[in-house]
Amino acid sequence: MTIGPIENISGIPLGILGTHLGFLEALVPDDNGMLPRNTDGEFVIAAGARELIELSPVKIDLIQISSFGTTNPDEKDALIAAVRDLGLEPQLVMMVGGVNPMNPDDEDEALAQLMVNLGAALRNNIAQVNSTSVETWMEGTPPSSEEEFEARVAQNIKLHLRAYEEAGLAGSCIDNWNIEFLRPGEFQNFTSLAKLRPILTGLNEKIGSPFFKALIDAAHCGDSGLSISENEVIV
């Protein structure tokens, strides 16, 4: 049975996650900064997105793409163009790897990785950027005290403020930078909206506008140890 087109009347854009098409297989660059392609030479992400568009009776509007600072800039630009050719709005999820955003000694290298991704967003007129850049995925250590946690918050504010200022994001095409917290195990520090909120509040107070926001994943909220009502209050 063929399903006819279904109109999305919710007013909420429908998006897909590039990670569902594969992480190592589709998103992580090789040692030369090149992104995975299929046997036809097409980006794995673009090919998978096209298949989903063809299968879905509801129009798909956007795609989140995990983006690494080690990816060749020309590859980033080509992938963004490829998904736009499919009628999708690309949203970058900026990743940091091999550095600890909470460690002052790693600040310059973490900044360099963020700047590569922000540069791609600015070059390609992307309106929304996202990141998991407050902590290294699967490699963090829990804070030993409240004072250590507060120091990690302060270092993240310093790092992300530098990225905002040095990339020239004020008045740019980028409307918002949405930072994501992850479930315990993936992160060790910023594992709930309550723990992430001090970073966002501190950044927005410094720049004087609500530019930094939380990227909310309902599953991560459920794993965070906070109830639905507690999450609602913080949101």
Where are these regions (language model features)?
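Active-site-proximal loop/turn and secondary-structure-junction residues that shape catalytic pockets
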Residues: 20-23, 67-69, 96-99, 133-137, ...
